[in-house]
Curated annotation (Swiss-Prot):
Keyword ATP-binding: yes
Gene3D superfamilies on file: Calponin-like domain (1.10.418.10), Kinesin motor domain (3.40.850.10)
PROSITE patterns according to UniProt: CH, KINESIN_MOTOR_1, KINESIN_MOTOR_2
Biased composition (Basic and acidic residues): 31-40
Coiled-coil regions, chain positions: 289-345, 757-788
GO MF annotation terms: ATP binding; microtubule binding; microtubule motor activity
Protein name from the UniProt record: Kinesin-like protein KIN-14K
Keyword terms: ATP-binding, Coiled coil, Microtubule, Motor protein, Nucleotide-binding
Pfam families listed in its UniProt record: CH, Kinesin
Sequence ranges assigned to domain Calponin-homology (CH) in this UniProt record: 40-143
CDD domains: CH_AtKIN14-like
Source taxon at top rank: Eukaryota
Gene Ontology cellular component annotations, sorted alphabetically: microtubule; microtubule cytoskeleton
Length: 975
């Protein structure tokens, strides 16, 4: 044992890296073997060996695997352990390197020493068995039993790189035979790294002696000297680090042993058995202390050597300091030059200071002059102050006088506001008496994604003023002013819009006819105002539902005095064709009786689903047809049994659109053309009504025919003008507002209520009976015409004009059994025509005309002579409908409804209306002018009716047959 310690200490003395560590390992190995024998070679022996090798760890003897893992996981302890066992073998990196790099270095060293290794994952989160086995193998390899030549050679190969040994060998081969020691080192398998320090110094002495003798040193010698010096320097530096570590180790061990001795001394008063055990435990510690003292003395000697090296380094630092002093002197000279420059700048500053002093004197003189001027101004201001006080007193007197006058003006202003409200009320009453079409303008808010766009709406007033701005023009042409009955801003709700229309809608129950229609470009919110985006949401419901809901509440509140019946029709005008939206299997427009709001919701849902809707660039849900919701109300007074009839037409017009912006093609282009055509026809009608032209072109479109009684009759009419505030739609907005301005100037006449008593109903029944008798006589006349052969020629021409099938709006009336036998309005209109034929025939007899001529005239009236007679008959029916408004506007409205939307079975309440129509139309004259003969006193027709129908007959003979009067087949809707 002592020989091994001496061997290890001798190797440390000659600075051998592997030898120096072997003595520590041998001593540690003996201690570890003793601890293994004491603890049965368990886990505690490994922990004790680690604490002894690296004292700063201070691991507890009973440390668990997790504590051991936490100590070894960063790899620093492993690398320090290997450096402690073999000093200088591991080069530690900086603190910035991760722990896995140190672990990889340790594992690479274990592979070079051919020792069992472990994986990085085992140390991080795996089983610690392989780690413990690897550490035990490392411990055994550096112990006394494992200290053999193979292990030593393996450690030496691991300590010195192969390229370095090869380089040194090559340098020694170039040395020649002059140095036997160098050649011997080269021929051996050991490098300079494995040579002892003493031999290296001897070799250096011999080289120096040889060089001093010959004074001729070759490159080989120089390289050898450099290699020797580098190895010596490296060993000395490593040894210094080892000395520091060992010194710390010895101090820690000494403190540890002292603490143990103190503990043992305090426990000496215990039992003898415990003292014996403690003595046994302290015995190896004492031996270790003796060994450490011996090692400490050796380390002190080595420390002196290191001290000499530090003195050499101090000399070098002193030389460097001298060089730095020279550099500092050079910098001092530069600073002196800068001081000279600073003095020159100081002189320059002095000259500038003198210049500023001169300026200061001039400024002082100027200030003194200004001070004198200010004193003069002060005296002047004092005089002005006295004048101002006098003027203030005068103003106070004037203000008190004007205040007294202003009180009277304020009192007059209050009365002026009352007068303005009264004038506004009277103006509305005058407008209602004149029958002007009311125009409400509603501005659609910006949609999502359009908030950043600039608006073309400049101002909206409370009294219906609207100012729009043209973004493309500047100056006085930028703004345009329009005035309407009401203007709703983008923030207005559906409830606010309906509250202004409620009084007009409620007048239906009093027997008035009301029409509300929405006009504007596509995507401006017409359908939103009339129907709403969702019927299920009460806040978003439009005028249609709110109007019907309000009517139901009124009918329920008045049910004790008046019994009401409400019927609903909903149609659309699609491509100049009328379609029923509430039923598809009925050829004509169907009337549906409703009794509650639930019925209305169901019907409106059906109508909205059946309505034609398409997507365009401007609007994803663009309405491609005009929607008409007609509400017919019939009320019977419980006491007087008088009948009230009113109708409400809620029209949602399709939006006008520019093909260039909407980018429609194909079927959508055709729809847009029909929509624009019908809206253009509506504009022509408005233009004619505004200028009070004698001829109004209602027949140019199905839309104008539907709105004929609302625009030209004595009904209450309201138009919603929907506009888009986007500046890109400025042209469409101005066009829409101009149209609305023309509409607001149309006078319809005072609206009248339709109310008939019991006597009127009896007279109408008598008239209907007389008409039935006339119809029978007309049939006998037709048989007589067939006998004379005229029927054949008339039928052939009729076949050319129009096939015998169901007619559409304004078409010629066929002589079908249903039309002939039914008591409706159309059959009675035909009987009126035959009655006029009889009157014409009787008048021709008084004039002495031929019988054949009368027959031909009757044939022309029936439509068997000329192709344009079909239109003439429709003109006669239109004249009957329009002229009836002279006596009662609601009668013509009901007649128009039945003419446009005939039903398979007319409701009973419509019979009385048709009888009243017949009574009003008794005086309608023939469509073709007769010969100038005195007329009998059988009937006295109205002058206005005769003149109007005769003028229509004259003009219709020159016009070609239009598509409006042609018959159409029942519509097959394709969705």
């Amino acid at each position: 044992m002592k020989n091994r310690i001496k061997k290890g200490s001798s190797m440390i003395g000659v600075y051998g890296r592997s030898d120096g560590s072997s003595s520590i390992q041998s001593s540690n190995g003996s201690e570890s073997r003793e601890s293994i024998d004491d603890n049965k070679q368990g886990h505690q022996s490994l922990v004790e060996w680690l604490n002894e090798t690296l004292p700063y760890l201070n691991l507890p003897w009973e440390a668990s695997e997790e504590e051991l893992r936490a100590c070894l996981v960063d790899g620093t302890v492993l690398c320090n352990l290997l450096n402690q066992l073999s000093p200088g073998s591991m080069r530690m990196g900086g603190s910035f390197e991760p722990g896995c790099v140190n672990i990889e270095r340790f594992l690479a060293a274990m592979d070079e020493m051919t020792l069992p290794r472990f994986e990085v994952s085992d140390l991080e989160q795996g089983d610690m068995i392989r780690v413990i086995q690897s550490l035990k193998a490392l411990k055994a390899s550096f112990s006394d039993d494992g200290y053999d030549k193979n292990t030593l050679s393996a450690r030496r190969r691991w300590s010195l790189p192969a390229d370095h040994s090869k380089g040194v060998d090559s340098n020694f081969n170039d040395g020649g035979s002059q140095f036997i020691e160098a050649s011997e080192i080269n021929t051996s398998h050991h490098s300079l790294q494995n040579t002892s320090t003493r031999s290296l110094f001897d070799m250096l002495d011999r080289l120096l002696d040889e060089s001093s003798q010959k004074m001729n040193v070759s490159h080989v010698y120089v390289s050898i000297l450099r290699g020797i010096v580098q190895v010596v320097e490296q060993r000395i530096s490593n040894q210094a680090e080892n000395l520091k570590n060992q010194n710390i180790l010895f101090r820690v061990r000494e403190e540890k042993y002292r603490s143990r001795i103190n503990v043992l001394e305090t426990l000496a008063s215990g039992t003898t058995d415990e003292n014996e055990v403690r003595r046994k435990r302290c015995a190896p510690n004492r031996k270790g202390k003796e060994r450490s003292n011996a090692e400490l003395s050796k380390l002190k000697q080595e420390l002196e050597i290191v001290k000499e090296t530090h003195e050499k380094q101090f000399l070098e630092l002193k030389l460097n300091a001298q060089k730095a002093k020279v550099e500092l002197e050079r910098q001092v000279k530069n600073s002196e030059l800068r001081v000279v420059e600073a003095k020159e700048l100081e002189k320059l500053c002095e000259t500038k200071t003198k210049r500023w002093e001169k300026k200061e004197q001039t400024y002082k003189r100027f200030i003194n002059h200004q001070t004198e001027a200010l004193q003069e101004l002060k005296a002047t201001s004092m005089s002005l102050k006295h004048d101002v006080l006098k003027i203030g007193e005068n103003y106070f007197l004037d203000l008190t006088y004007y205040g007294i006058k202003l009180r009277g003006v304020a009192h007059a202003a209050k009365n002026y506001q009352i007068i303005i409200e009264e004038n506004r009320r009277l103006y509305n009453e005058v407008q209602e008496l004149k029958g002007n079409i009311r125009v409400y303008c509603r501005i659609r808010p910006f949609l999502q994604g359009q908030n950043k766009k600039q608006t073309s709406i400049e101002y909206t007033g409370e009294n219906g003023e609207l100012v729009v701005a043209n973004p493309l023009k500047q100056g006085k042409d930028t703004y345009r002013l329009f005035k309407f009955n009401k203007v709703f801003g983008p923030e207005s709700t559906q409830e606010e819009v309906f509250l202004d229309t409620r009084p007009m809608i409620r007048s239906i129950l009093d027997g008035y006819n009301v029409c509300i229609f929405a006009y504007g470009q596509t995507g401006s919110g017409k359908t939103y105002t009339m129907s709403g985006p969702s019927i299920t949401s009460e806040e978003d419901r439009g005028v249609n539902y709110r109007a019907l809901n309000d009517l139901f509440h009124l009918t329920q509140s008045r049910q004790n005095s008046v019994m009401y019946e409400v019927g609903v029709q909903m149609v659309e005008i699609y491509n100049e064709q009328v379609r029923d939206l509430l039923s598809q299997d009925v050829p004509d427009a169907s009337m549906h009786s409703v009794r509650s709001t639930e019925d209305v919701l169901e019907l409106m849902n059906i109508g909205l689903m059946n309505r034609t809707v398409g997507a365009t660039t401007l609007n994803e849900k663009s309405s491609r047809s005009h929607s008409v919701l007609s509400v017919h109300v019939r009320g019977v007074d419980v006491k007087t049994e008088s009948v009230l009839r009113g109708s409400l037409h809620l029209v949602d017009l399709a939006g006008s659109e520019r093909v260039g912006r909407s980018e429609v093609t194909g079927e959508r282009l055709k729809e847009a053309q029909h929509i624009n055509k019908s809206l253009s026809a509506l504009g022509d009608v408005i233009f004619a009504l505004a200028h009070k032209n004698p001829h109004v072109p209602y027949r140019n479109s199905k839309l104008t025919q539907v709105l004929q009684n609302s625009l030209g009759g004595q009904a209450k009419t309201l138009m919603f003008v929907q506009i888009n505030p986007d500046e890109d739609s400025y042209a469409e907005t101005v066009s829409t507002l101009k149209f609305a301005e023309r509409v607001s100037g149309v006078e319809l006449g005072a609206a009248r209520s339709y109310k008939e008593g019991r006597d009127v109903r009896q007279l109408m029944e008598q008239v209907s009976n007389l008409k039935d008798m006339i119809a029978k006589k007309d049939e006998e006349l037709q048989k007589f015409q067939n006998i004379n052969g005229i029927q054949k020629r008339g039928l052939s021409k009729l076949r050319i004009v129009s096939p015998p099938r169901r007619h559409s709006l304004g078409g010629a009336l066929t002589n079908s059994p249903r039309r002939r036998q039914g008591p409706g309005l159309l059959g009675r209109t035909t009987s009126d025509i035959h009655r006029h034929q009889n009157e014409s025939r009787s008048s021709s007899k008084f004039s002495g005309g031929a019988k054949d001529n009368n027959i031909f005239e009757d044939t022309e009236l029936l439509g068997f002579e000329e192709s344009n007679n079909e239109e003439r008959l429709s003109d006669i029916s239109d004249s009957c409908l329009s002229m009836g408004t002279e006596t009662d506007g609601s009668i013509s409205s009901g007649a128009m409804e039945l003419t446009l939307f005939p039903e398979t079975s007319n409701p009973p309440e419509m019979f009385e209306q048709s009888e009243q129509n017949d009574k009003a139309h008794v005086g309608v004259g023939p469509s073709k002018p007769l010969k100038h003969t005195p007329k009998p006193d059988i009937s006295k027709p109205s002058r206005l009716s005769i003149s109007t129908t005769s003028s229509k007959a004259l003009t219709s003979s020159k016009r070609p047959v239009t598509g409006i009067s042609s018959s159409v087949k029942p519509l097959n809707r394709k969705r």
